């Protein structure tokens, strides 16, 4: 039994139980703290503003001003 105790002690020292994530520690469970971060897509530099595209799914353009855009292949 002492070998099992030594093994358990070594395992707990190498990987303590406190290192395991608890459900309450997840950011998705704390919406109030997420809202206090105040990071939104309007202010965050990683999100760029994209202009509305007037091209259709297949790349064909129906409007004259859209034909001048790069997405139409002209």
Curated annotation (Swiss-Prot):
Segment forming the signal sequence: 1-19
Keywords, sorted A to Z: Acetylcholine receptor inhibiting toxin, Amidation, Cleavage on pair of basic residues, Disulfide bond, Ion channel impairing toxin, Neurotoxin, Postsynaptic neurotoxin, Secreted, Signal, Toxin
Subcellular locations according to the entry: Secreted
Tissue: Expressed by the venom duct.
GO terms for cellular component: extracellular region; host cell postsynaptic membrane
Residues bearing PTM Cysteine amide: 72
Disulfide cysteine pairs (residue numbers): 54-66, 55-71, 61-72
Proregion residues excised on maturation: 20-50
Record has Transcription regulation as a keyword: no
InterPro entries documented for this protein: Conotoxin
Note: Negative results: does not show inhibitory effects against the mouse muscle subtype sodium channel Nav1.4/SCN4A.
Function: Psi-conotoxins act on postsynaptic membranes, and act as non-competitive antagonist of nicotinic acetylcholine receptors (nAChR). Reversibly inhibits both adult- and fetal-types nAChR. The inhibition potency against the adult- (alpha-1/beta-1/epsilon/delta) is higher than against the fetal-type (alpha-1/beta-1/gamma/delta). Induces flaccid paralysis in goldfish, but does not induce any remarkable behavior in mice and does not block action potential in directly stimulated frog muscle preparations.
Full protein name: Psi-conotoxin PrIIIE
Source species of the chain: Conus parius (Cone snail)
Lineage, opening ranks: Eukaryota, Metazoa, Spiralia, Lophotrochozoa, Mollusca
């Amino acid at each position: 039994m002492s070998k099992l105790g030594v093994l358990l002690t070594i395992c707990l020292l190498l990987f303590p139980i406190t290192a395991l994530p608890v459900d309450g520690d997840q950011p998705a469970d704390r919406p109030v703290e997420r809202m206090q971060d105040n990071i939104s897509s309007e202010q965050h530099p990683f999100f760029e503003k994209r202009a509305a595209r007037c091209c259709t799914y297949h790349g064909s353009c129906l409007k004259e001003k859209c034909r001048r855009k790069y997405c139409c292949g002209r």
